[in-house]
Amino acid sequence: MADFLGMMKQAAQLQSKMKAMQDELDHVEVEGASGGGLVSVRMTAKMEVKAISIDPSLMKPDEREILEDLVVSALGDARRKAEVAMQEKMQALTGGLGLPPGLGLG
């Protein structure tokens, strides 16, 4: 019975830590870029896009498709970085619990 109570206490602590981590992820920002920095995207680790920056040299009607491709690429770069930031936070939270890799509690 004591083991069960200990597990329940540990689960409650983990839930509290998960909530704090989720709140913290709102404030972790990453930036993805493409085209050598001509297009950049800033987003939170929870993948909420905060800003897109486009160099004025790309604002030409005949370069629209290139610009669109660069925006997609920058979004992908930012998304990958956001995933890494989230995984690092999760690892810090669950590292001592002995959970299998990739369990994904988030």
Curated annotation (Swiss-Prot):
UniProt main location, coarse: cytoplasm
Compartments in which it is found: Cytoplasm, Nucleoid
UniProt key word Cytoplasm: yes
GO cellular component annotations of the record: bacterial nucleoid; cytosol
Sorted UniProt keywords: Cytoplasm, DNA-binding
Pfam families reported in the protein's UniProt record: YbaB_DNA_bd
Keyword Cell inner membrane: no
A GO molecular-function descriptor: DNA binding
Family statement: Belongs to the YbaB/EbfC family.
Function of the protein: Binds to DNA and alters its conformation. May be involved in regulation of gene expression, nucleoid organization and DNA protection.
HAMAP family named in the record: DNA_YbaB_EbfC (MF_00274)
PANTHER family named among the record's database cross-references: NUCLEOID-ASSOCIATED PROTEIN YBAB
Assembly and oligomerization: Homodimer.
UniProt name for this protein: Nucleoid-associated protein Nham_0463
